[in-house]
């Protein structure tokens, strides 16, 4: 399969589409945790109860269509190959926990903006993932899916506590709202160490690209709410919206300051990273993330011309181990992965430049 066709098939909407403020906000995510009323939580339920949840979703929702979202398809974790599960995780469509659940499943929309995880930490986890800064659109879609499911499922709900969940931190609205942000300006100007504690004071948490316990590779940070009880869904989304909007403003100011005060140094950093990506024959994940962040910053500041700004979103995912092995058609040793990663990046950059040259020639 050619890289062009592989990318077309592999990319989710949030990776290839542009959204509001997408130079800084890569994606907006809403996740709702829900449970069946008369079935024990996943930590305590029987195999029969777990199977019945999957079966109910297959009967009522798989193959069905929801307006503005499209048709859903059920993927059972027990039927998916380890590599397929890893790719779904790398695309942020399922969690690492779900890949290990013997009775896990995922109901996925056609454009992959909506994924409904089954038998993870909770019976149901509705996720809506949109490109750019679109928390309001994401919560609207999540509520639409939630109402659709509730037509067939009686949720565990208490008048005082709200939606009941396996983890006490999710009780209440069951809502986790998050934005994935590219913040190289704030990192390079050494402001993130000051900003993160301030964000934590507001009841929000800052994590890496793959959530809890992950490192902020490539200057990509995930900011989400911590509290779900005692606040309405609207308040949670509004609070995160407000903090994200301030971060966007601060990041833009930091980038402008860098460009004005350290232009040569910044250009040198950007073009060195571009040179590495364009010419390397082996490259590890960590160096890839650093170089992609530099190049994306260069694109956004107009230092590098002729490259799509979505290249960071694409290559941060396509160069993960699961995708590399899927593209190569089998398992790879670490050094083989590093070589395959370098080849994929070089070919992707070449495709981009060739497409832009053709556009210029046709004008």
Curated annotation (Swiss-Prot):
EC number: 2.7.14.1
SUPFAM superfamilies the UniProt entry points to: Glutamine synthetase/guanido kinase (SSF55931)
MF annotations from Gene Ontology: ATP binding; creatine kinase activity; protein kinase activity
Catalytic class of the enzyme: transferase
Alphabetically ordered keywords of this record: Allosteric enzyme, ATP-binding, Kinase, Nucleotide-binding, Transferase
Pfam family name, one: ATP-gua_Ptrans
GO BP terms in the entry: phosphocreatine biosynthetic process
GO cellular component terms attached to this protein's record: extracellular space
Description of how activity is regulated: Appears to be allosterically activated by the binding of pArg-containing polypeptides to the pArg-binding pocket localized in the C-terminal domain of McsB.
Catalytic activity: L-arginyl-[protein] + ATP = N(omega)-phospho-L-arginyl-[protein] + ADP + H(+)
Domain of life of the source: Bacteria
Residue positions binding ATP: 27-31, 92, 125, 176-180, 207-212
InterPro entries associated with the record: Arg_Kinase, ATP-guanido_PTrfase, ATP-guanido_PTrfase_AS, ATP-guanido_PTrfase_cat, Gln_synth/guanido_kin_cat_dom
Motif extent (RDXXRA motif of the pArg binding pocket involved in allosteric regulation): 337-342
Domain Phosphagen kinase C-terminal: residue ranges: 24-254
Family recorded in the similarity comment: Belongs to the ATP:guanido phosphotransferase family.
Job of this protein: Catalyzes the specific phosphorylation of arginine residues in a large number of proteins. Is part of the bacterial stress response system. Protein arginine phosphorylation has a physiologically important role and is involved in the regulation of many critical cellular processes, such as protein homeostasis, motility, competence, and stringent and stress responses, by regulating gene expression and protein activity.
Name of this chain's protein: Protein-arginine kinase
Gene that encodes the chain: mcsB
